[in-house]
């Protein structure tokens, strides 16, 4: 079931979420957590066993934790209710009809961790892609699974940088 939000009749994200949760659904998708009231309801619902999915405007997966904390959600509630956060970017795809190999300088290969056999392409432009070299988009995802250490870091109010450093080192 999908419920439209209509502020003219006082049907906000928060009031719609309350109504949905009274029906004890297996999964709830909240279009976007925009305010403290909706965040609080979603977090408390997840603590009672509801599976809640939602979106937030952040730059990366760790930013979701900070965003919810900035909305007033207590760190112990975040660490108890969050299982995973993710972020996505849509990147342009190189046109398959006009792609051609491109040389990558050795210093850049090393910096990017590219194997010497890895072929890097660029699109030269053709009729199929409107001479842009690109055709379509592809999602690039960043996923943060919250293990016990990350949850402990949240409770201790660790910075985004500290959580990111831990995740890069331990959660690959």
Model-derived features: positions:
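Short, flexible helix-loop junctions that flank or precede catalytic/ligand sites
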Residues: 1-172
């Amino acid at each position: 079931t999908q419920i439209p939000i209509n502020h003219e009749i006082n049907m906000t994200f928060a009031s719609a979420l309350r109504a949905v949760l009274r029906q004890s659904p297996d999964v709830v998708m909240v279009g976007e957590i925009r305010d403290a009231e909706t965040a609080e309801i979603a977090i408390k619902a997840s603590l009672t066993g509801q599976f809640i999915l939602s979106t937030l405007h952040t730059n990366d997966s760790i930013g979701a934790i900070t965003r919810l904390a900035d909305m007033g959600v207590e760190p112990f509630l975040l660490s108890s209710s969050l299982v995973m956060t993710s972020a996505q970017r849509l990147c342009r795809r190189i046109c398959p009809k006009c792609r051609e190999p491109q040389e990558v300088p050795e210093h850049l290969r090393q910096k990017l961790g590219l194997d010497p056999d890895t072929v890097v392409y660029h699109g030269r432009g053709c009729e199929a892609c409107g001479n842009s070299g690109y055709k379509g988009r592809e999602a690039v995802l960043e996923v943060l699974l919250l293990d016990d250490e990350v949850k402990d870091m949240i409770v201790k109010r660790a910075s985004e940088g500290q959580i990111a450093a831990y995740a890069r080192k331990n959660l690959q």
